[in-house]
Amino acid sequence: MMQKGYIYKGLKPVYWCADCNTALAEAEIEYQDDPCYSIYVKFPITDSKGKFDDLGIDLSKAYVVIWTTTTWTLPGNLAICLGPNYEYTFVKVEDEESKSFGQYLLMATELVSTVMDAVGIKKYSTVGSFLGSELELIETDHPFMGRKSPLIVGDHVTLDSGTGCVHTAPGFGLEDFEVCNKYKGMFKIIVPVNEKGVLTEEAGDFAGLKTADANKVIAKRLEDDNTLLAMQKIVHPYPHCWRCHEPIIYRATDQWFCNVDMFKAETVKAIEDVQWIPEWGEERIKNMVNMRSDWCISRQRRWGVPIPILYCEDCGKVIVNDETIKAISDMFRRESSDSWYSKDPSEFIPASVKCECGCNKFRKEMDIFDVWFDSGCTHAAVLQERPELSWPADLYLEGCDQYRGWFQSSLLTSVATTGRAPYKAVCTHGWVVDGKGEVMHKSKGNVVLPEEVISKYGADVLRLWVASLDFHNDVRVSPEMLKQLSEAYRKIRNTARFILGNLGNGDGFNPDTDMVALDKLSDFDKWALSRLDSVIEKVKASYEAFDFYLAYHAIHSFCVVDMSNFYLDIVKDTLYCSAEKSEERRAVQTTMYIILDSLVRLVAPILTFTSDEIWKYMPHKSTDDLRGVPFNQMPEKTGVEISAEFEAKWNKIHAVRDDVLKALEEKRTAGVIGKSLDAGVTIFAEGADFEQLSGYPELAQAFSVSYVNVKNGADGEFKGAVEGVSVTVEKAAGEMCERCWSHAPSVGSDAQYPHLCARCAAVMKLDLG
């Protein structure tokens, strides 16, 4: 960056912590609401350049009024800045009770009523009208420093507050500094406050005062001289040091800077080539880069990464060339950057290196790098220096405050040196707060410690909590929320446990030899796989978009609604009562294996320990990598073919099933039936509904009852949510099979198994031989 001319040393106002005695970056600033006094100050006009001759104004009574919240900066005032296109006017004070009675006060026309209310002047009139540009170079006297403060113009002036006449102290403000520099040779920048926050001799009578103490003393001086128009106590956000939390100041000092303007356009282009998650992050960092000034990269601290710059002992010229860069880099590589502090330049700089003046003796720069410059170089120090790693990084992940911190410093150093961003994607997160949305503090007793959560619920519940929330915003955590998440976790785990149990019983299920082709699966099985395909698609898309909470909700809903509440419930009869190696049972096992194999892969990024446990116990294909889930690919969709007619059929079955379950519950409450298999159900429907439902032989299994009859009509006892369909529930006819618990006319038809239905008797004979 130095070789490209991006780095320079210069005098410029920077954030300065007088307590830490160092410059600060914007990312090292935190704002707190502070009480302070704002003051309105009168600067007497001494040379109007003839602009006011036609107004009949007594110049000895004419003043420009400024407003400031930092009284201590007034000794550094060199000018008053006006907006070139704003209208200004004189306010003649006609309030006899005012100390300013009979005076003419210049301010922005738009702010007259606001200012007069603030200073308590009730009677006044206005005289004259001027654009700010017409008043340029009119002279005023500084109220107490014995020098001129001319009127200048600048586009940074606003009418949001104050008087429209801006107190300009270039040693204490960047905009002040820049606008004064436009007036070439007119101003000599002064900084009448030292590194400890104490006013210097350049502050005149106020030398030796700390800035906080100077506020009161200067205000008293202004009041005694009748140049203090008004003083008000206000509370406003004020910058504080992030380390010591003390108020900071803006102070012009000699620092090392990076000229961001030289590669700003290139940086904005690089931003557009990055995936920002969430998307608004792109606009946010673009605005920050476009609006930022040069980057102050030096700090005045006793430890840190040194700025490897040398100065000529004789003429003070900065010495940086290929030889010094190589010599210092080699030393740092061998002995670390700490060697900078222990060695004399003569020990590591080649004797051939000389200043243009001929001197070969040098002194070291003792400032250190801004920590953000330091951390912003990690992409080069870590990724580019290690062949086993790739550059740029796939992802930078941090809190949303890092748009002005690590994300931006990394971006600037990378674009400056390589022309592109150091990352392919950037993802930001919010902060963790308690269940009420309040910041956690030990004193409040609302801190939730991760180790306590892990001890009580396990690490996967903590991971599930993280995944269950939209982390782009602040996320809440409380014992109640974690308890709810533990229940959700148990639902997912129990789904896997049920499937594992039914794949492992008997001789077990071997996916290499026992799988049933998709086209031979029942409609129940095909429906389950169609739901799985939908989940696979949604979860993978959610992971790609870093929307982990959408992935979690899709998985949880699938396990609870589609599996536990429906599919796994209705296939129990097949699993428990069909012959162990029958095609219908193998079909259900095939479906469950596909579901479990997909589910364990889908949950692995969130429930890492649980997925690993499932992987160890589940059956595997010979092509699986048995080392663990992460060594295998995410699942692909099963490819089961589902028509629109099929989907409509199952939507109807689900809707009618909900009504049937409610009707069963009514009869159970009335004591007519016990379990659902004690019931027989008659569905009444008309027209297309009758034709559709009467063609479903699977209804008894879908409703978990002994039998279902479908009749044309509307005579059902229970009318539910499905329009045109009603339900009647009766105690099932026939004896109960002691094996499958269904009531069937065939119970007792087999002499060998008189207490079983015909199906169960046949299975017993097949399995027992």
Give short role names for the model-derived ranges:
Residues 1-75, 94-96, 137-139, 147-152, ...:
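Residue patterns forming the tRNA-binding/recognition surfaces of aminoacyl-tRNA synthetases
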Residues 150-152, 720-756:
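C-terminal accessory/binding modules appended to enzymatic or scaffolding proteins
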Residues 320, 361-372, 388-405, 442-445, ...:
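Secondary-structure capping and boundary motifs in well-ordered enzyme cores
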Residues 13, 237, 308, 348-353, ...:
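Short metal-coordination and nucleic-acid-contact micro-motifs, chiefly zinc-binding Cys/His arrays
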